[in-house]
Amino acid sequence: YKGPIAVIPNPVIFPQEVSLKFRDECLKYRIQGKKQIGFLGRLHSIKKVENIIYAMALLNEEESKLLSFQVIGKYDESYEAFLRAEVKRLNLQDSVTFVGFVTGLEKYERLSQMSALMVPSEQENFGMIVPEALICGTPVYASLGTPWSELTEHNCGWWKDNEPGTIVQVIREILCMDDSEIRAMGVRGRKLIAKKYEHHKIAGMMRDLYHWLLTENNKPEFVYTL
C-alpha cells in the first residue's frame, strides 16, 4: 500500500465523576505513610508484572516499608499463581496485594489512590490503561514496549526499559517525591490527554478526514503520504 495514511489516536472519554478533586478524595483512603504503586490489566506473561516484583526485592528494608504494590486484574490463572509464588519466595507478602478484577468507578478510585501506575509490558499497541490513569491525575511508568514516549516528553511519568534494575530506580524516585510533586506530574498528564486524546477532539479529526476524502481540499496534518 502506497496511498495516504491517517494517524488518529484512540479516543479517551473523561468520566464525569473523575476529576482532580475526585483523586484528592480517593487519596484519603490509601494506606497512610506509604506510597502506593499498582498494575491494572490482564494478567498475562506479556505484561511482565514479575519485573515489578523483582524490582521491589531490590529495595532495602526501610524503602520496602514505605511502599505497597497492588496487582489488579485477572486472566491467566497459571500466571497469577506464578506471581503469587514469586511474592512468597521473595518474602514480599506484606507489600504486595492481589486485588482481582475491578471495573467501573472502582477502577478509577484505585487508579486515583496510586502514586504511579506501572506498565512494564513487553509490548502494547496503545495501552488504554495509560490515559485512564493520567485522567485520574496519576503519573505512569511505561516500558519502551509501549508507544508512550510522551510520558517523559511532558514530564508526567517515565518511559524506560522494563528491566528490574530500571524499575527500581523509578520506584526510588517515586519514594523520594512528595505528594505535591506527584500531583503536579498528574496534572500535566491529565492536560496531555485532554489536549490530544479527548474523544471530542478525535471525533473532529475523523470529521476532517472524511471532509478531505470527499472534497480533496485541506488535507489534515495527520494524513501522511509515502
Task: Label every PLM stretch briefly.
Residues 35, 39-58, 63, 69, ...:
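A conserved mid-protein helix/loop that constitutes part of the nucleotide-sugar donor-binding site
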Residues 81-102:
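Nucleotide-activated donor-binding/catalytic signature segment of Leloir-type glycosyltransferases, i.e.
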Residues 139-143:
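Short hydrophobic beta-strand element within catalytic cores of glycosyltransferases
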